Amino acid sequence: MMKQEFKEDFFEVLRMIVESDSMALSRYADGEANVLKNNTIGNKDGWLYKQDKNLVFRADLRKALLCTDPNYFYGISCTCCDKPNHDYLLSIIRTGRENLTFSNIFVNANFPLFQEHFLKTLAASKKDIVVCTGKKAKMRDLNERVPVKDFIPIPGNCVVWWEKNREYIRGLLDLKASQYTNAVFLFAAGPLSEILIHEMWQVNPKNIYVDIGSTLDPFLFRRNSRVYHRGDSEFAKRYCSW
């Protein structure tokens, strides 16, 4: 159960990764909110949503925000960083408050905690680890810190890839979700992560599905891709409030 307390919720997620056999954490922030609003938006990682063009992607992203299963959690924008999108996302979500936390749960002032505890928690869980992220990820670097059982690569612009290959990808997700039980799936695929988590949850909720965003970029892509990766930044010291 989430309490909308920045540090406390972080450790609750870690506890569930170890102790639960069924949990999803899907995170919606400004990028996802702008897609839902049908605004053209993209980012440095190479994904781009075009207004009125990628409406299939938008529809699937919206549906992925409506789950009310008791073990399905959503992280959304906080009031201290983005109150307009906090309010907007709350107006769409149907699940209860106990299933809501911060989209920033792994970043900002919690990032040092993530660095210290997250990979250790994965190792301590002794569960199979499956990573879904960009195809150029350096899986060997991550493997040196935690054993990765499987890798689902995402090529190019995730928005276009999903729309052009939707049925094939659904088949692939069905295969992967049904191959594992009580495994931990880590997603770092932009706003597509939320769709993938929802699709796999519907196939097999007896796994752990977590959107980790850019947190492992220093390992996976050998770069500090976000400001919070640098400990001297303003964001690295921000303790988010609900």
Set out the residue ranges of the language-model regions.
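A short, acidic, amphipathic alpha-helical segment used as a generic capping/interface helix at domain edges
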Residues: 8-12, 56-63, 164-177, 193-194
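C-terminal functional extensions of proteins
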Residues: 188, 192-242
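Structural motif
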Residues: 128, 183-184
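A polyampholytic, Gly/Pro-enriched intrinsically disordered region
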Residues: 122-123, 130, 169-177, 228-242
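Residues at the C-termini of beta-strands that transition into short coil/loop
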Residues: 78, 152-155, 213
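Electropositive, gly/pro-rich neighborhoods at or near active sites that engage anionic ligands
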Residues: 1-145
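Residue-level detector of flexible, active-site-proximal loop/helix-junction positions
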Residues: 81, 156-158, 216
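A mid-sequence, solvent-exposed acidic-amphipathic segment
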Residues: 143, 147-183
